[in-house]
């Protein structure tokens, strides 16, 4: 965004990008943006704005844009929809052709993770809507304008493992997973596709290739390049929630399947 000082993270696509480290690099009350991940489908932009940061309403005519919300509270007014206040763990979508006006409203800084097209720009400006209509009335996921983490926890509860497909479009699939400590998934790898996660709550241990496992917590991002085997386990004493970002047509090769090809990157 034009009104944010844009810095490229020291190294893009780190195995773990720590929430505390990125926030620690910038003054609390300043607008800034960093690009921690470029996965071939998306440019992922970590954006901070203190309340009062001027909006920059604009339109992307040929791709959908979405955001994972972190610290603070951010108000989205998308297309003709009524404004929505989004907070930690929520996902917002601006469908192609829908103007979006984004305003940080609460917290010392409001943090959002923008998942945008690599060639995104703000050249086409939006105008205020001439009327407002309710958001997502009577609709179910995926691809709600606003996926509320609070609502998901009320719907699914916290007494079981569950998954919710939040976004499925031509570029991305965003899957929300709630898991109990000790839950471990089968090890697999994906051809031709980088993959990453945003940890929303709890602690998750990521075992990637033959490297030492790494543990990530709330607000951290974890990145795995295509062709690299990995599996995850929730650790600690409380459930974890993560958002997994992949291509829509994801292919799994399981390492315990004797007929599956071996992972080229281990």
Where is each model-derived feature located?
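A short hydrophobic beta-strand segment most commonly corresponding to one strand
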Residues: 93, 107-125, 223, 237-255
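A short, N-terminal "cap"/entry segment at the start of jelly-roll beta-barrel domains
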Residues: 2-43, 56, 122-180, 184-187, ...
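Short, conserved beta-strand element in jelly-roll/cupin
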Residues: 48-50, 59-76, 115, 179, ...
């Amino acid at each position: 965004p034009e009104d944010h000082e844009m810095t490229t993270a020291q190294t893009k696509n780190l195995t773990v990008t720590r929430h505390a480290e990125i926030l620690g690099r910038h003054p609390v009350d300043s607008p800034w943006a960093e690009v921690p991940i470029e996965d071939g489908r998306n440019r992922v932009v970590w954006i901070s704005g203190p309340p009062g940061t001027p909006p920059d309403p604009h339109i992307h005519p040929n791709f959908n844009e979405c955001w994972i919300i972190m610290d603070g509270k951010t108000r989205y007014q998308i297309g003709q929809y009524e404004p929505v206040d989004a907070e930690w763990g929520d996902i917002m979508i601006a469908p192609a052709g829908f103007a979006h006006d984004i305003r940080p409203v609460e917290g010392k800084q409001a943090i959002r993770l923008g998942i945008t097209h690599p060639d995104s720009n703000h050249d086409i400006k939006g105008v205020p809507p001439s009327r407002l209509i309710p958001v997502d009335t009577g609709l179910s996921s995926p691809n709600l304008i606003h996926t509320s983490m609070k609502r998901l926890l009320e719907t699914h509860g916290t007494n079981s493992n569950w998954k919710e497909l939040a976004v499925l479009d031509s570029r991305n699939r965003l899957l929300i997973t709630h898991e109990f400590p000790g839950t471990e998934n089968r090890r697999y790898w994906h051809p031709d596709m980088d993959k990453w996660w945003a940890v929303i709550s709890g602690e998750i241990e990521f075992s990637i290739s033959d490297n030492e496992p790494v543990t990530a917590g709330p607000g951290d991002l974890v990145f795995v390049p295509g062709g690299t085997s990995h599996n995850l386990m929730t650790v600690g004493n409380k459930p974890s929630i993560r958002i997994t970002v992949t291509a829509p047509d994801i292919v799994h090769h399981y390492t315990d399947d004797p007929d599956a090809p071996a992972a080229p990157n281990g």
